[in-house]
Each structure stands twice: as structure tokens, then as C-alpha cells.
């Protein structure tokens, strides 16, 4: 590198040999553009400044430059730096020093091509010429093409840019750069969890190639930017240097990725049984990788080497965790589920957070009771889903057996070939004849005789049955909105006033179940039918009606199956592409559009709710939006996303009917949220498996891009709220509701809750993604951002409570469960435990909302409708009611523990501030109260409870086999004793190894609080649900004898029960004669010392929680 002194000597005739002259001579080598702007130039062509400004980089001949300077000498003073005789300030000296230090770095920077600056959410830009606004807008940082910044391969890009050249790392003569190694260590130490960074070549367990050159380059550039930014009153030339260095950092982020050493990978294949994906998470920067907030992977091998999680026996306790041998992501909870806290990992995380508050025996008992109730709840959920899977596979037989109208014998899956089949036709007739008439005919205008005449016409029968279901559902909603209208008998004056008798209401519910069974039967019959041109649209309308009915009944399993069929058919028919609309009449085209966007809304909402990836790729959807969107100036999805944030005349929304405005708002929210999902939550840029092996600085840059994406999406949400302001006025009671019918009021309230839920879920899911990229120690900026996110969750929850308490009837509140309950769970397990303490006003609000749910719950348990307890509608509401009961209990316990109140003290305080609700907290805190009645009834064991004993055995065997102080004979002896002591979970502490003793000491503060029945939620891990997909490929379905109705036995079992093992759970590898029972609540709470099992399942997995 040419020094300043040699430069001045090479031009002795131009100016005196002093530093100002040297500076001016160096400017003579600048390009014309930099000279014109009076900024630094490195002499390259093109130079970084011209690249940034997007202008042509030209250089004037040296002689002409010299002549120009000579001619201008008498007209103006020299433009060089301050002479030696003039004093300079400290800032000027610092600036000069840094310029000398980092200009050589800029000279070696390879400035790759940049794309035009545009927002990340506007899609992937095409390669183009550099623009002058690359640096500026925070979102513009993320405008690069995610699939590569240039067409040059990554390796060649960095060869050309000389990133491996020592000159780039040692380009300064200053002491600071000479001591760069120590500064580099300091920088890495502050960013990478205090895990000593080492060469990948030195660790045989890491299968990535060495990235020291990239790591050093990133650290040098980051340090340069930080020092330049720390200067006060810096001139524009410094800003130009900062922009150039940040551009290079982004270039590295966009183009470089950790390279896999496939030779190492082959060697490691024989050394481990773990998947290659698991091994690819191992890297030199961190021993922990969060797939989500709750799902944490630990590098046990490197943890051992760094003495992390080392037990007194000399081996890694973490390696014996049950959780370490299970997939982190299970099929029930998906990747971004809102109820992830009820998974195996989630429960461990929550128990860890509650641990500091579990200081008394009462607190421990409350927590164990809660975990027992949660386990029972999950068992019931799996039981219901199993019933649904059987119902849709064999709908006619299932219904008739349930009503004891068929022998309870195993029957192979029906062979649906023709409705003329004698057996199928007979079963259809048998169900039709049981439909309660003439009441159902008065509701649907269809008689049983008409159904018998249509039974051979599959398509017409399917459509007729679905329309009947729609009419019955509308009648049911009307009755339930004022359930006081259900009377024992009608008087003469009540014949036409909208009231119904108990018998009529019972007929309504029973008829809906019969019709649903018939609908499933004809769905199976028409599934593989060929429809002539023109009739396929009618079939799609039928599928949409079936989906509506399943949503109303919360048919989890059946809805997913029908939805997949409907989406596949719609895409095959080209509903999502404009090309398939050319030539249609506009009326037909609009019908197709409405069907597609309704299906799109269903599919996106379902996958978002469950945490799954959508099967609809937005990049392939280019059909026009429905008419309501076009009326507002949005032609298609892309145009809507581009213009939603632009100012517009909001008066155009004032005359839109409420029902239409609700549909517009729902689809608008779905489109905006889906865009965020595809650009961030599932984008390879942020979820690539290689991200775990990237330097912390690059991870932090990705986090900043996600935070910017959240802010942009929230701005779109705010725009939608302004457009739908009329609905908010209705929901919050700012408009006289007498002028609006009940249906519109309920629709407005439901939409506003949906809006708050979208805002809630956006933050929650984005935080899960951020957790994957976080490094330790967390910066103050990141901690501030995450706390802000969690506080915003609280604000959205408060708005939800206000909306619910403003609703007219309890039944309408019950229909909002899908939005409210998951939000409460996230709040209870995150915000109130991490960033803010719950106050009494929060408890009052939660109990007041619960009271509204409870009113309907008490009605369902009344003598009027107790005979309907096993119907679809009431069973599903009972499940929802149980969930909200558990959440309310959790929040009360959380408040008690944070405020250090006993149960008696809390009840007294609550009674003083809220006497009208004083009767509810004692019931919520008493697990034997009527609120938990449905959870404590007997059901046959699901995959959770059946696998629980196996988990206990495996966890204990792990500890024995890893204990180096036990010889093989001792192990055999202990194993024999252990197998004798395992009749139930209440005897898990009889034989404890030295290892588990040591583990228990670490958790001594919890006493016997480690209630590990939580593992049954995902234990093996979700065997019941994982086999659901196998139903379609097998020749038979599980026998109905394997299941017992929930209400068939009133007493909770107290001992072991020999239960036939359902084929659905065979993949667990459990003995089919395995029996296990949770026992009674008292046994579980009073006899179960599960401290050791907590350590076996989770150990120190949550020693470093997310925030």
C-alpha cells in the first residue's frame, strides 16, 4: 500500500511536502463525480460512491487536472486539509485517523450489483442497475434479491472481492488494526454466548467448512462502522465510508452461506444416529438453537467439552433428557402453533418460568393440580379427533353404532363404489327415516320422502343435504342467541313468537348429526366422480358448504381432509389464475372468483391457526379480487399489497353493508398476513438451516430485517382498521345497536376480535422466528424490541376483553373462542411472566369475560339439554369451555404467586374489589368443582397416557445406562427393581440413581412440584395424531370398541385398567397389553413426587430461556 509520505514525494512539484498537500494530491486521483461532490474516492472504477449514487464513474486526464488546478490557484484557496500551522480539533483528528485507517478497506471492497430499492414486501426485485437510494429506508436494507445478488456463484464472488486476501484484514498501519485480533476476540465474546469460537477444521463434530476469513471480515467491517458512527459532527465523507462498508456487509449477508464439508458429513454418518439436519445445527458459535421460543436444540457433544450441563458423575445430564431424543416439532402443534405452550417442550418451558414462584406447599399443589387437568384436557382432545377420523371414514356405520342401532363389531372400511349397493342404500334409508319430522321439514322445506327419492342421485343429494345443514345451523344460532326462548312447552300465545320447546331443540341437534353423517357418506361417493364441464363449479360450491358446516362444529380432522380436496380441485380448475377466466360470462367469472377467495381465506386461516405451512403459493395466485375490492381500486392481490398503505378517501367505506365490509376485512387481513408468512416466517433467508452457522453479526442483521417487516405489516393492519372503522364503532357500542340487527352486530364483533387476533399472532409468530436467530448476550436494542412486542400483546388483549364484554349475548361470545383463548394462553405464558406483573384489574377483566362463557356452560349442563351432552355441538363447546377454564385458572395462580398471596388471601382481596364475581375464583381454584366435571370423567387412554409409562421407563433406563459408577450387574439389578416399581406414575421415586439424585438437588427449590405428566402431551410425542394420515392408506380403521364415550362412566378410575390397545397408536412401539392410568387427582397430587422425572425429561434444557 502506498503511504501518505511516499505519495507526496512522488509529486514534489505540485505542492510542498506536507500532509495537506498529500491530501490534495490524493484528491487528484478521485473520479469526476467524487470531486464534484467533494467526498472521498478510492480510485477504483467504478468507485463505491458512484455505485451508491448510480452515476457514471469517469476520470479526467491527470495533465488536464493539473492544469485546471494551476489555473484556479489564483482564484480560490487550496481545498486541501488544514495546514500544520492551524490547530485542529480533537474531532478532526479522529476523523483523519479513521479515514486513513478504513479507506484501504474500502479500496479492497468488491461492490456487487444492487437491485432497485423497494420494500421487501413488494416481492423479489429483478436484477438491475445500482440506484442512489440503496441506503436510507430501513426496509430498503432488505430489498436485495433473496435468491442471490448476482449471477456469479458465491465462491467466485468472494474470490473476485479478495475477501480471503490478507490485505483486507491487515490494511492499516495503525495500532488499532494491528491489535485487531484481540478486538476480534472481544467482539465475538460479546456476541456468541461466551462459547469460544474456533476453526471448524479443529472440531470433527462440526461438518461446516472453515469460515474464519468471513468471520474476521465481518468483525472488522462491523467494528469500522461502529467506530465511524461514534464520531461527533462527522462530515459527509465519513457517511460515505459508512455507507460503503454497510453495503459490503449486506453483500456478504446476501451472497455468502456456510459451506458443508461433505467428507466430514460422511464420516459423521457412521458416528451418530441423529439425522443430518440435527447435525447441521452444530456450529462453533452457539450450543443452543431455538427452532421456536419453546423448542430448543442443544449441542450436547460440545456442551460436554465446554463443561456445560456436566453432572458430578462426569457425563452430560442433558444427554439423558427424554426431550433430547424426540423431534422438536410435532404434528399436532406445527411450527408456529398458538397453543405451543401445551406441547412437551412448551410445558417444560412454562414450569421453568413458574419455578421461582413455587415457594410454598400450596403453590406446588396448585401447579400439580393444573398440570393434571391439562393432561386430562389433551387426552380428551385426542379422543375427539380419533372419533372424527372414524366418523368421516365410515360415517353411516359410526352414527348407527353410536346410537346402538348396529352391532358393535369391527367393520372394514366400506367400499364406496355405487349408491346402488344394497348395504349402503339400506343404511342411508335407515338414517333418513329417523330424521324428526315434520319439525325439520318446517325448518328446511325438505321432507324425508324427498330425500328418499334423491338418494340415488349423488350430486343432487349431496347439495340438498348441505343446504339442509345450513338451514338447521341458522336456526340453531338463532335459538342459542337467546336460549331463554327454549321452553318446556308452548302456550297458545307462544306458537309464533320464535320460541321452541326442549323437544324441538333436541330434534334440531339430533337432525344435524344425522345430516352430517349423510353428508360425509355422499362426500365419499362423489370424491372420485367425474363432473362434466359446467357442473364442476356446483361441486365446488358443495365443498364450500361442507367446510362451513365443519367449521361450525369444529371438526378438526374432517375439515383438514375436505379442505385439501377442495384446494386441489380449485387449482386444477384454474380458479387462482386469470388465464382460466378468459371467455367466461362475467357472472360466471365472479362466481369463480368468490369461490376461490373464500377457499383461500379458509385455507390460510386454518394453516395459520394450526401453525402449518399453506399449500397455496401466493406467487402463483394472479386472479382478480372480488368486486368489493375492485370497487375500492384494488384489481388483484399484488396491487392491494402495494396500495393498502397509501392515503385514500375513506368515505367510500361508509355505505358498504356491514356483512360485506366484514368479508372484505377478513380477506384483507388474510392477504396481508399471508404475505408476511411467505416473506419471513417460511422464507429460506430467515429459516435456512445454515443460519445457525452464521456469525452473530449476520444473524443480528436478519433480526433487524424481521423487525422492519413486522413494522411494515402492522402499518398495513392499521390501514385496514381505518377502512373498517364502522365495524369498530358497532363492536365497542359507540353506535346505537337498536338500529342494527343481531346478525350484523355479531359479525362486527367477531371481525374486530379477528383483527386483534391477527395482530396478536403476528407478533407471537415473529418472536418465535427471532428466537431462532438470537445470540448471547442479547443487545439492549433487541431486549427493548422484544419487551415492546410482549407489551403490545397485552394491549391487544385488553381491547379483546372490551369487545367481548360489549357483546349482546353469551352464545356470540362462545363463537369467538378460537380468537380469544389462544391469545390468553400466549399472554399467560409470556407477557405476564417476562415483562410485566399482572395486576388485580387484569384478573377482574379475565374473570368477567370468563363469567360470560360460564353462563352458556351452565345452560349446557342444565336439565333442559343434558341429553344432548354427547352431540357434536355441545361436546365441542364443552371442550372449548374447558380450555378457557384452564387459562383462567392459570392467570389467577400466576397473580397469586407473583403477589405472594395464599389462596385465602387472594379470595378475600378479590371479594373486596369485585364482590359481584366473588363466587368464581374459589370454583376456578378447586379442581373438584363442577367447572372441571367433563375433564375428570373416564375415557379410554389415548396415545398420551398409554405412552407415559414407556417414557418413565426410558428416562430411568437412560440414567442407569449412563451412570459410569454402576457396573452391568448393578444395572440389571436396578432395572429389575425398577420394572417392579412402575404400576403407576405415583411411584417414580422409589429407586433413584446417583445421577437423578444430583439432578433433584439442582431443582430442590421446587419440592415435589415437577409434575411431568406433561410429557404425555407430545410424549411419543403425538402418536395418536401422527397415525391419522395413515387411515387413508390402510384397509381398515380402528375398532369402535377401543373407545368409550366420555360420559359413559361417572366415576374417575382409581387404579389400573386393562385396555385394548388401539391400532392407531401401534407405532409407539409399546406393548399392546401396556396399561397405565393417571389415577385420581388426589393420587396424582399427594403421592406423586415427580421432581426426578422433570430432570429426566427436560433437565437444564430451559436454563437459558428466550428472554
Curated annotation (Swiss-Prot):
Changing residue 376 to W: Gain-of-function mutation leading to increased PDR1 activity, fluconazole resistance, as well as to decreased adherence to and uptake by host macrophages. It comes from the Eukaryota. Changing residue 764 to I: Gain-of-function mutation leading to increased PDR1 activity and fluconazole resistance. Residues 323-476 are annotated as: Inhibitory domain (ID). Residues 542-616 are annotated as: Middle homology region (MHR). A motif (9aaTAD) lies at residues 1091-1099. Induction: Expression is up-regulated by fluconazole and during biofilm formation. Expression is also induced by oxidative stress caused by the antifungal drug, benomyl. Expression is regulated by the regulator of proteasome expression RPN4. Transcriptionally autoregulated through a pleiotropic drug response elements (PDRE) within its own promoter. Expression is also up-regulated by clorgyline, an inhibitor of azole transporters. Expression is negatively regulated by the J protein JJJ1. Residues 968-1107 are annotated as: Activation domain (AD). Keywords: DNA-binding, Metal-binding, Nucleus, Transcription, Transcription regulation, Virulence, Zinc. Changing residue 1099 to D: Gain-of-function mutation leading to increased PDR1 activity and fluconazole resistance. PROSITE patterns: ZN2_CY6_FUNGAL_1, ZN2_CY6_FUNGAL_2. Its main location: nucleus. Disruption phenotype: Leads to hypersensitivity to cycloheximide. Leads to an 8- to 16-fold increase in fluconazole susceptibility. Also leads to increased rhodamine accumulation. Changing residue 280 to P: Gain-of-function mutation leading to increased PDR1 activity and fluconazole resistance. GO terms for cellular component: cytosol; fungal biofilm matrix; nucleus. Residues 1-11, 1010-1022 have a biased composition (Polar residues). Residues 31-57 bind DNA. One of its GO terms (molecular function) is zinc ion binding. Gene3D superfamilies: Zn(2)-C6 fungal-type DNA-binding domain (4.10.240.10). Changing residue 584 to C: Gain-of-function mutation leading to increased PDR1 activity and fluconazole resistance. One of its GO terms (biological process) is positive regulation of transcription by RNA polymerase II. Master transcriptional regulator of a pleiotropic drug resistance network that contributes to the azole resistance of clinical isolates and petite mutants. Regulates the efflux of rhodamine 6G. Regulates both constitutive and drug-induced expression of the pleiotropic ABC efflux transporter CDR1. This is Transcription factor PDR1. It comes from Candida glabrata (strain ATCC 2001 / BCRC 20586 / JCM 3761 / NBRC 0622 / NRRL Y-65 / CBS 138).
Amino acid at each position: 500500500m502506498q503511504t501518505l509520505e511516499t505519495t507526496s514525494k512522488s509529486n514534489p512539484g505540485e505542492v510542498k511536502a506536507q500532509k495537506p498537500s498529500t491530501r490534495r494530491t490524493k484528491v487528484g486521483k478521485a473520479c469526476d463525480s467524487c470531486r464534484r461532490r467533494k467526498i472521498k474516492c478510492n480510485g477504483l472504477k467504478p468507485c463505491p460512491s458512484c455505485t451508491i449514487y448510480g452515476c457514471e464513474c469517469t476520470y479526467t486526464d491527470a495533465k488536464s487536472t493539473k492544469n485546471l488546478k494551476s489555473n484556479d490557484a489564483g482564484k480560490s484557496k487550496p481545498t486541501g486539509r488544514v495546514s500544520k500551522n492551524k490547530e485542529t480539533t480533537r474531532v478532526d483528528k479522529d476523523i483523519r485517523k479513521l479515514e486513513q485507517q478504513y479507506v484501504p478497506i474500502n479500496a479492497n471492497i468488491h461492490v456487487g450489483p444492487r437491485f432497485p430499492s423497494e420494500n421487501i414486501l413488494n416481492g423479489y426485485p429483478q436484477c438491475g442497475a445500482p440506484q442512489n437510494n440503496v441506503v436510507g429506508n430501513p426496509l430498503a436494507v432488505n430489498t436485495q434479491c433473496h435468491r442471490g445478488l448476482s449471477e456469479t456463484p458465491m465462491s467466485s464472488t468472494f474470490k473476485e472481492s479478495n475477501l480471503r486476501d490478507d490485505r483486507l484484514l491487515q490494511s492499516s498501519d495503525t495500532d488499532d488494526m494491528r491489535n485487531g485480533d484481540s478486538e476480534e476476540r472481544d467482539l465475538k465474546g460479546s456476541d456468541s454466548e461466551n462459547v469460544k469460537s474456533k476453526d471448524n477444521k479443529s472440531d470433527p463434530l462440526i461438518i461446516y467448512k472453515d469460515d474464519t476469513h468471513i468471520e474476521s471480515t465481518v468483525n472488522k467491517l462491523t467494528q469500522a462502522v461502529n467506530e465511524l458512527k461514534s464520531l461527533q459532527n462527522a462530515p459527509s465523507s465519513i457517511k460515505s465510508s459508512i455507507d460503503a462498508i454497510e453495503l459490503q456487509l449486506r453483500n456478504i449477508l446476501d451472497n455468502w452461506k456456510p459451506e458443508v464439508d461433505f467428507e466430514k458429513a460422511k464420516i459423521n454418518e457412521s458416528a451418530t444416529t441423529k439425522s443430518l439436519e440435527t447435525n447441521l445445527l452444530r456450529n462453533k458459535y452457539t450450543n443452543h438453537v431455538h427452532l421456536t421460543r419453546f423448542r430448543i436444540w442443544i449441542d450436547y457433544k460440545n456442551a460436554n467439552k465446554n463443561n456445560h450441563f456436566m453432572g458430578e458423575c462426569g457425563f452430560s445430564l442433558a444427554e439423558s433428557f427424554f426431550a433430547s431424543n424426540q423431534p422438536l416439532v410435532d404434528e399436532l402443534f406445527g411450527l408456529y402453533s398458538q397453543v405451543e405452550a401445551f406441547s412437551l417442550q412448551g410445558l417444560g418451558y412454562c414450569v421453568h418460568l413458574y419455578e421461582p414462584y413455587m415457594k410454598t406447599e400450596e403453590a406446588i399443589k396448585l401447579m400439580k393440580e393444573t398440570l393434571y387437568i391439562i393432561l386430562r384436557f389433551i387426552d380428551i382432545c385426542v379422543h375427539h379427533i380419533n372419533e372424527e377420523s372414524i366418523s368421516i371414514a365410515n360415517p353411516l356405520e359410526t352414527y348407527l353404532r353410536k346410537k346402538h342401532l348396529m352391532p358393535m363389531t369391527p367393520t372394514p372400511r366400506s367400499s364406496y363404489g355405487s349408491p346402488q349397493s344394497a348395504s349402503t342404500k339400506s343404511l342411508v334409508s335407515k338414517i333418513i327415516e329417523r330424521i324428526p319430522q315434520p319439525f325439520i321439514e318446517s325448518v328446511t322445506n325438505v321432507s324425508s320422502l324427498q330425500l328418499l327419492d334423491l338418494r340415488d342421485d349423488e350430486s343432487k343429494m349431496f347439495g340438498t343435504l348441505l343446504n339442509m345443514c345450513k338451514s338447521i345451523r341458522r336456526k340453531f344460532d338463532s335459538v342459542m342467541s337467546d336460549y331463554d326462548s327454549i321452553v318446556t312447552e308452548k302456550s297458545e300465545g307462544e306458537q309464533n313468537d320464535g320460541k321452541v320447546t326442549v323437544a324441538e331443540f333436541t330434534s334440531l341437534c339430533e337432525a344435524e348429526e344425522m345430516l352430517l353423517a349423510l353428508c360425509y357418506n355422499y362426500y365419499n361417493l362423489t370424491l372420485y366422480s367425474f363432473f362434466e364441464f359446467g357442473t364442476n363449479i356446483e361441486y365446488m360450491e358443495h365443498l364450500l358448504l361442507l367446510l362451513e358446516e365443519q367449521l361450525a362444529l369444529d371438526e378438526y380432522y374432517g375439515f383438514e381432509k375436505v379442505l385439501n380436496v377442495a384446494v386441489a380441485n380449485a387449482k386444477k380448475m384454474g380458479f387462482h389464475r386469470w388465464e382460466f377466466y378468459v371467455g367466461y360470462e362475467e357472472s360466471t367469472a365472479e362466481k369463480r372468483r368468490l369461490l376461490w377467495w373464500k377457499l383461500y381465506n379458509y385455507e390460510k386461516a386454518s394453516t395459520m391457526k394450526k401453525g402449518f405451512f399453506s399449500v397455496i403459493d401466493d406467487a402463483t395466485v394472479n386472479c382478480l379480487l372480488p368486486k368489493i375490492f375492485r370497487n375500492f381500486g384494488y384489481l388483484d392481490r399484488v396491487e392491494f399489497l402495494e396500495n393498502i398503505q397509501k392515503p385514500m378517501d375513506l368515505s367510500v367505506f361508509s355505505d358498504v353493508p356491514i356483512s360485506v365490509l366484514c368479508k372484505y376485512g377478513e380477506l384483507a387481513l388474510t392477504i396481508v398476513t399471508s404475505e408476511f408468512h411467505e416473506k419471513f416466517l417460511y422464507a429460506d433467508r430467515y429459516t435456512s438451516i445454515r443460519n445457525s452457522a452464521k456469525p452473530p453479526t449476520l444473524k443480528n442483521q436478519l433480526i433487524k430485517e424481521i423487525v422492519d417487516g413486522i413494522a411494515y405489516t402492522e402499518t398495513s393492519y392499521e390501514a385496514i382498521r381505518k377502512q373498517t372503522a364502522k365495524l369498530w364503532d358497532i363492536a365497542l357500542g359507540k353506535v346505537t345497536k337498536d338500529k342494527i340487527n343481531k346478525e350484523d352486530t355479531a359479525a362486527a364483533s367477531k371481525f374486530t376480535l379477528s383483527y386483534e387476533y391477527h395482530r396478536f399472532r403476528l407478533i407471537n409468530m415473529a418472536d418465535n422466528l427471532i428466537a431462532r436467530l438470537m445470540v448471547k448476550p442479547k443487545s439492549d436494542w433487541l431486549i427493548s424490541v422484544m419487551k415492546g412486542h410482549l407489551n403490545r400483546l397485552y394491549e391487544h388483549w385488553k381491547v379483546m376483553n372490551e369487545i367481548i364484554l360489549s357483546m349482546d349475548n353469551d352464545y356470540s361470545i362462545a363463537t369467538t373462542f378460537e380468537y380469544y383463548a389462544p391469545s390468553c394462553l400466549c399472554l399467560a405464558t409470556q407477557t405476564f411472566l417476562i415483562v410485566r406483573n399482572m395486576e388485580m384489574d387484569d384478573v377482574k377483566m379475565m374473570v368477567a369475560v370468563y363469567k360470560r362463557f360460564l353462563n352458556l356452560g351452565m345452560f349446557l349442563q342444565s336439565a333442559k339439554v343434558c341429553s344432548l351432552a354427547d352431540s357434536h355441538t355441545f361436546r365441542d363447546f364443552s371442550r372449548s369451555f374447558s380450555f378457557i377454564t384452564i387459562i383462567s385458572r392459570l392467570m389467577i395462580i400466576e397473580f397469586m404467586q407473583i403477589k405472594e398471596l395464599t389462596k385465602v388471601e387472594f379470595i378475600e382481596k378479590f371479594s373486596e374489589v369485585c364482590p359481584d364475581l366473588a363466587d368464581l375464583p374459589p370454583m376456578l381454584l378447586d379442581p373438584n368443582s363442577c367447572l372441571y366435571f367433563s375433564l375428570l370423567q373416564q375415557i379410554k387412554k389415548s396415545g398420551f397416557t398409554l405412552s407415559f409409562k414407556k417414557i418413565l421407563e426410558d428416562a430411568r433406563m437412560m440414567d442407569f445406562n449412563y451412570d459410569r459408577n454402576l457396573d452391568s450387574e448393578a444395572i440389571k439389578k436396578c432395572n429389575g427393581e425398577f420394572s417392579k416399581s412402575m404400576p403407576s406414575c405415583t411411584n417414580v421415586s422409589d429407586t433413584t440413581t446417583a445421577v437423578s439424585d444430583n439432578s433433584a438437588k439442582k431443582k430442590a427449590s421446587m419440592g415435589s412440584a415437577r409434575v411431568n405428566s406433561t410429557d404425555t402431551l407430545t410424549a411419543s410425542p403425538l402418536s395418536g395424531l401422527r397415525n391419522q394420515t395413515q387411515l387413508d392408506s390402510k384397509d381398515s380403521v380402528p375398532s369402535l370398541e377401543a373407545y368409550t364415550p366420555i360420559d359413559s362412566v361417572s366415576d374417575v378410575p382409581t387404579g389400573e385398567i386393562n385396555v385394548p390397545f388401539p391400532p392407531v397408536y401401534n407405532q409407539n412401539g409399546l406393548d399392546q397389553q401396556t396399561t397405565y392410568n393417571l389415577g385420581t387427582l388426589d393420587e396424582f397430587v399427594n403421592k406423586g413426587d415427580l421432581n426426578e422425572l422433570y430432570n429426566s425429561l427436560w433437565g437444564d434444557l430451559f436454563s437459558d430461556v428466550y428472554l
